[in-house]
């Protein structure tokens, strides 16, 4: 891992997690943290416009110790805080790195956003974008940077497909067409379906040491 300039703490891998409101971003972070926290040193930065609600949710769920979670109140458009002016998020990541000098990984969860949201490369080394089946099978073919450019696309809540009339086969075909050669995974996070594929992606693409 790289070091911060003249500092005694390393720079952790930073993974941006984006997606529309209700798609399952916070639920994904909760289950990821609980699953790999004994193997890696983890922290989380959450973004909300006027509150720190997502940070509180993760703390109440005991996903991580409270001092490993920072909630950023963006006070405006959540896109700006992860793209045009990521200074608040960058400061939060650095604060966590100072608190925990051997930090391996920081997740940066965006505020609820739309398909056009992207993370500044200064803020995120890798990006995961979460959509959910309940939004309808048309979502993958709508495109947008979240669909086409994210390093990993997570299509969540596959258990709801029969209830909303969505075809997972159609969604998979559209996803493969919209992001050729880029990975995607279908998940039901409540049952842990697809979780290991996400973890494998993080470890492999993030070049984290493999820990049994």
UniProtKB/Swiss-Prot annotation:
It comes from Vibrio parahaemolyticus. Its main location: cytoplasm. Pfam families: cobW (PF02492). This is Urease accessory protein UreG. It comes from the Bacteria. Facilitates the functional incorporation of the urease nickel metallocenter. This process requires GTP hydrolysis, probably effectuated by UreG. Keywords: Chaperone, Cytoplasm, GTP-binding, Nickel insertion, Nucleotide-binding. Belongs to the SIMIBI class G3E GTPase family. UreG subfamily. It is found in: Cytoplasm. Homodimer. UreD, UreF and UreG form a complex that acts as a GTP-hydrolysis-dependent molecular chaperone, activating the urease apoprotein by helping to assemble the nickel containing metallocenter of UreC. The UreE protein probably delivers the nickel. GO terms for molecular function: GTP binding; GTPase activity; nickel cation binding. Transmembrane segments: none annotated.
């Amino acid at each position: 891992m790289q070091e911060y300039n003249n500092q005694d703490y390393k720079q952790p891998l930073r993974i941006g997690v984006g997606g529309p409101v209700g798609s399952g971003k916070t639920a994904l972070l909760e289950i990821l943290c609980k699953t790999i926290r004994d193997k890696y040193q983890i922290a989380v930065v959450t973004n909300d416009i006027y509150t720190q609600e997502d940070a509180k949710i993760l703390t109440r769920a005991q996903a991580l110790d409270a001092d490993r979670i920072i909630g950023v109140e963006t006070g405006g458009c959540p896109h700006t805080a992860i793209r045009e002016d990521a200074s608040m998020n960058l400061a939060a990541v650095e604060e966590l790195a100072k608190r925990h000098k051997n930090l391996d990984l920081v997740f940066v969860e965006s505020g609820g956003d739309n398909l056009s949201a992207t993370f500044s490369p200064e803020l995120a080394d890798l990006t995961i974008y979460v959509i959910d089946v309940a939004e309808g099978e048309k979502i993958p073919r709508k495109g947008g940077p979240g669909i086409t450019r994210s390093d990993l696309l997570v299509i969540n809540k596959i258990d709801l497909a029969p209830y909303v009339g969505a075809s997972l086969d159609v969604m998979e075909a559209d996803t493969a067409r919209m992001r050729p050669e880029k990975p995607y995974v279908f998940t039901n996070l409540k049952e842990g379906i697809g979780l290991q594929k996400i973890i494998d992606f993080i470890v492999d693409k993030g070049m984290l040491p493999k820990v049994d």
